[in-house]
Amino acid sequence: MFYPDPFDVIVIGGGHAGTEAAMASARMGQQTLLLTHNIDTLGQMSCNPAIGGIGKGHLVKEIDAMGGLMARAVDQAGIQFRILNSSKGPAVRATRAQADRVLYRQAIRTALENQPNLTIFQQAVDDLIVENDRVVGAVTQMGLKFRAKAVVLTVGTFLDGKIHIGLDNYSGGRAGDPPSIPLARRLRELPLRVNRLKTGTPPRIDARTIDFSVLPQQHGDNPMPVFSFLGNAGQHPAQMPCYITHTNEKTHEVIRNNLDRSPMYAGIIEGIGPRYCPSIEDKVMRFADRNTHQIFLEPEGLTSNEIYPNGISTSLPFDVQWQIVRSMAGMENARIVRPGYAIEYDFFDPRDLKPTLENKFVHGLFFAGQINGTTGYEEAAAQGMLAGLNAARLSADKEGWSPRRDQAYLGVLVDDLCTLGTKEPYRMFTSRAEYRLMLREDNADLRLTEMGRELGMVDDHRWARFNEKLENIEKERQRLRDIHVHPQSELLDQVNSLLKTPLSREANGEELLRRPEVDYAQLTALPLFAPGLTDEQAAEQVEIQVKYEGYIARQQDEIEKQLRNENALLPADLDYKQVNGLSNEVIAKLNDHKPSSIGQASRISGITPAAISILLIWLKKQGLLRRSA
């Protein structure tokens, strides 16, 4: 039977991508249905109990800047907050939080259940309804049919998922959950490129069996950072330390002696695992010259006895896992409460997607998260938000939107996936972005909140706070520019106390702040420049904008040059065999990738500047060169 009410958008899957997709669509006013196999696991952290990190924290801030959920949830659930790279420049500083799994899941579910325009329904999805290359609905396990104008697939590791522990394996979406086999088979019938990837998770340890007294502690920062631009440290629950132990030669010997029982080394696992989160057996073999690896013992929550040993992801048999755990300091009597495992699953080539994350071959079908070959909660959530907002726009007959590489890490992520594809689980790093100085955590709202408002994602409260911050920044910069000090000033000694070289000419507040030895707090502590801003976010922006003004201006010039290519659009149905002068290799790559713009084409491996010039000349001659607004 058909469900009585039609929907604008259906989201399939309730993980990090699915929850952001559903929230985005509903916030934009579209009637949205979230289908999940289990309402109790909405927003579940399937692997590590943490949000953020290098590159990843930037994505969380961008999600928040556009009205998304992840940052607000972790502010309510985070049990340890730290700024990574705090001694480095603002471009690579990143926020990371350990999270209480239960509190995080509760925060996500509460937000979903109180979101207008959003319906949640518990049923696994077995099929899609596709008519004339257009998706028009979904069919659940019990045969119930739902109609919609757009469907977002956020199915994580569930598509034909297979769990491996040693040489044994069984079907599963993750530990304790069934796989999605009928839906995987249905998707393989569509004209899409599919492959397999692998990821893994470590065994969980009973904290009561660990001797923490012999292990160094790692505490969070004080004062505590916050993730959301609307958040404050008062929202954080009680804070907890992490602990550090290390593998040793005994650990490595256990691993080397049992490699024949590893499904990866025995050739049973075919999927490629994440390069930057390797299993402990992979680390021991790939870095054979190292006799120790650092392991972080991370608490899973305030009311849980489980410890997540970050750094020993493994698919070795349980008896070997037991030996590995007990070989490390403080863990001699440790007990495992959940075994580690690897999981293989289907993913679909993201080069078959438009930058909006809509599929090129099935109209109205959007993919987000691990189905696109990414790894990580943050990467999934960012894609989910983008897919959800574009599904909502499509259902309202509006054009899609996607950020450029110079606008957001989300733009880098999507462009990398859609242009280059991936053969291994893709994770975000700051090093993937050309314009890191422009794409900082601290200015995510300045980059994206206005666009979020235009798209209908940003509510009145966030918009008012954003405009207040903008006003504070501009007023303070003008105030500093208006205050001058000269070498004959009575206050010269106070100013010189901050400077490495005494002031020899008249200078205003901004010129003094531009000096590397002067920071905003020191400057505004002087009577002449007091009082400083009480809005810490605005004060940080004033300092960064002033100190990095020259560098930012140079990077903006580079961006404007690149935009000329980004805005030169390529016809979606162009057969590059028609373009005289291109090599067979270039023709094959362009026809395979089907880039949407000259800029995207230029980033495909093997596409030379000469080939781009030939293509531009041909497009002009044919009258096909169009530029986006």
Curated annotation (Swiss-Prot):
Enumerate the subcellular locations listed in this protein's record, separating them with semicolons.
Cytoplasm
Q: What SUPFAM superfamilies does the annotation carry?
A: FAD/NAD(P)-binding domain
Binding positions (FAD): G13, G14, G15, H16, A17, G18, V125, S180, Q370
Task: Please state the protein's primary subcellular location.
Answer: cytoplasm
What keywords does the record list, in alphabetical order?
A: Cytoplasm, FAD, Flavoprotein, NAD, tRNA processing
Q: Which Gene3D superfamilies match?
A: FAD/NAD(P)-binding domain, GidA associated domain, C-terminal subdomain, tRNA uridine 5-carboxymethylaminomethyl modification enzyme MnmG/GidA
Instruction: Report the record's Gene Ontology biological process terms.
Output: tRNA methylation; tRNA wobble uridine modification
Entry binding sites for NAD(+): 273-287
Q: Which GO terms describe its molecular function?
A: flavin adenine dinucleotide binding
Could you give one GO CC term from the UniProt record? cytosol
Record-annotated membrane-spanning stretches:
none
Q: Which cofactor does it need?
A: FAD
- Which SMART domains does this one have? GIDA_assoc_3 (SM01228)
**Assembly mode:** Homodimer. Heterotetramer of two MnmE and two MnmG subunits.
Task: Say what the protein does.
Answer: NAD-binding protein involved in the addition of a carboxymethylaminomethyl (cmnm) group at the wobble position (U34) of certain tRNAs, forming tRNA-cmnm(5)s(2)U34.
Give the family, as the similarity comment puts it: Belongs to the MnmG family.
Under which name does UniProt file this protein? tRNA uridine 5-carboxymethylaminomethyl modification enzyme MnmG
Organism field: Pectobacterium atrosepticum (strain SCRI 1043 / ATCC BAA-672)
